[in-house]
Curated annotation (Swiss-Prot):
SUPFAM superfamilies: MoaD/ThiS
UniProt source species: Cereibacter sphaeroides (strain ATCC 17029 / ATH 2.4.9) (Rhodobacter sphaeroides)
Pfam family, any one: Ub-RnfH
Name of the gene this protein is made from: rnfH
Annotated S-S bridges: none
Top-rank taxon, per record: Bacteria
PANTHER family according to UniProt: UPF0125 PROTEIN RATB
Name the UniProt record assigns to this protein: Protein RnfH
Record family assignment: Belongs to the UPF0125 (RnfH) family.
Length: 85
């Protein structure tokens, strides 16, 4: 089955389609996507993940067409940084 795995930084957005077997977890899809190697700052013990904008545990079983999103931690000064842009 095909699922998406997405990660975004302020300057780069990546969305990969990954072919995974039935019963694959969010963690397994992220690992298969190659994003952990591409973005070494991703720490699955720190970064939250979700499916279509809803936070979920890493062991959540995926369905065909799900989009797994890896969220960056909120920076305490994010609001100030946004105003500077």
């Amino acid at each position: 089955m095909i699922v998406g795995v997405a990660y975004a930084k302020p300057t780069v957005q990546v969305w990969k389609h990954v072919d995974v077997p039935e019963g694959t977890s969010a963690r397994e899809a992220i690992e298969r996507s190659g994003l952990l190697a591409q973005f070494p700052e991703i720490d699955l013990e720190v970064n939250k993940v979700g499916i279509f904008g809803a936070i979920c545990p890493l062991d959540r079983t995926l369905a065909e067409g799900d989009r797994v999103e890896i969220y960056r931690p909120i920076h305490p000064e994010a609001e100030l940084l946004e105003k500077k842009r």
